[in-house]
């Protein structure tokens, strides 16, 4: 699968300046056919009160990846908005960083579905997410 829009990782990361994405420290790290990847630190910004990665931070990473991937699959003048996010948390993470990998499940004219898997630094699956998006425009 080829992306419909051609952007560099630098351009993707620049688009996140002064947003929640930047505040959480999310950085896009890989863009290739059918895969968008990003990393997020596990630190005070993303911890819950017990010192573990907050489930909402994992969800924010997933929605960030799925929404950007969805936009990369639209035509000029179109955008995507999230319609549903499901997250299943498999294991805790207390420090370091996590990596999210986003791949398409369904790419329709009006809707898309994305799977985002979050891994810890040892490559263990920590969270599995599915994001639904609507294509507007």
Curated annotation (Swiss-Prot):
Active site: 63
Example GO biological process: enterobactin biosynthetic process
Places the protein is found: Cytoplasm
UniProt-listed Enzyme Commission number(s): 3.1.2.-
Class of enzymatic activity (EC top level): hydrolase
Recorded GO CC terms: cytosol
CDD domains given in the database record: PaaI_thioesterase
Keywords, comma-separated and alphabetical: Cytoplasm, Hydrolase
Binding partners and assembly: Homotetramer. Dimer of dimers. Interacts specifically with the aryl carrier protein (ArCP) domain of EntB.
Function comment: Required for optimal enterobactin synthesis. Acts as a proofreading enzyme that prevents EntB misacylation by hydrolyzing the thioester bound existing between EntB and wrongly charged molecules.
Family membership: Belongs to the thioesterase PaaI family.
Name of the protein in its database record: Proofreading thioesterase EntH
The species this protein was found in: Klebsiella pneumoniae subsp. pneumoniae (strain ATCC 700721 / MGH 78578)
């Amino acid at each position: 699968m080829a992306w419909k829009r051609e952007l560099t990782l630098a351009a993707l990361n620049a688009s996140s300046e002064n947003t929640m994405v930047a505040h959480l420290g999310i950085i896009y790290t890989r863009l290739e056919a059918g895969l968008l990847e990003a990393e997020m630190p596990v630190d005070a910004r993303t911890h819950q009160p017990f010192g573990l990665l907050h489930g909402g931070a994992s969800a924010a990473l997933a929605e960030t990846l799925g929404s950007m991937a969805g936009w990369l699959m639209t035509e000029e003048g179109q955008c995507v908005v999230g319609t549903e996010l499901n997250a299943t948390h498999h294991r805790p993470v207390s420090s370091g960083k996590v990596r999210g990998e986003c791949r398409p499940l369904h790419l329709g004219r009006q809707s898309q579905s994305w799977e985002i898997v979050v891994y810890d630094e040892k490559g263990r699956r920590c969270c599995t997410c599915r994001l639904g998006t609507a294509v507007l425009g």
